């Protein structure tokens, strides 16, 4: 038997050896240096910005309670698509207290982990402050209705798997579940904010949402790096969580009143649709992790990795089917607009 044959045999055996099953406490300890390193990296590249710099305050005026005029639909300068997308993004950001609780419970508030959780929360809070100020000052939405939606959304909270929210398998039962979910979710949110800015067709809104989307991208990189490090420590456990998250993925704003209807408007308008979810979120992250190239996944982990192909195939079909439906919908809308114009 040649030396190369022996080496190949040993390598093959290594790939079938059961891997250590880490507890969340052990993973928190193993990943702590990575968290500290990436927090420092994040702070080094983060560009400070202030919400008040991107609000056209000169357009503002008192509402009726202070002797001014209450909101009127004619005051809105945004398209229906931009308005729906802005409201959905804002209400999603409004649930930050619930997200903070989920992250803090699945991570820890001790040491570098706690430093990151609090920094992430502080940066995220800017987003709702800025978007709300913009919408209220420019009178782009009904502020009374917006406040009612905020209260209802926050009362519902964000507790996947509890209070009949989203089913038992939708979100995080473990540390890996949590970091895998936010790796995809933060990137999805970045895409949504960026495209909402374009849909607004208004320079100040576009600049504001560019800053917010940049924040989300940096958050995604942090969490993506956590999963990447986790794949080196416990590849089978990590790929199992990645599979779970992708097989049950939904955006965190799913508790928003009218979310399904708004999601259709947002998708049809090209802000965030099945194709962008696949091509701009799922596939780039999986490529970065080299999921299908790794040679350290075996046993149960290999089954979950192979089944990712089924999930991706399903996402491709969903994207293709949606494009067909979207085309027919837009054609109907165009014909309706022509008929309305002919009556004028």
Please report, for each region that a protein language model flagged, where it lies by residue.
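Non-heme di-metal
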Residues: 2-344
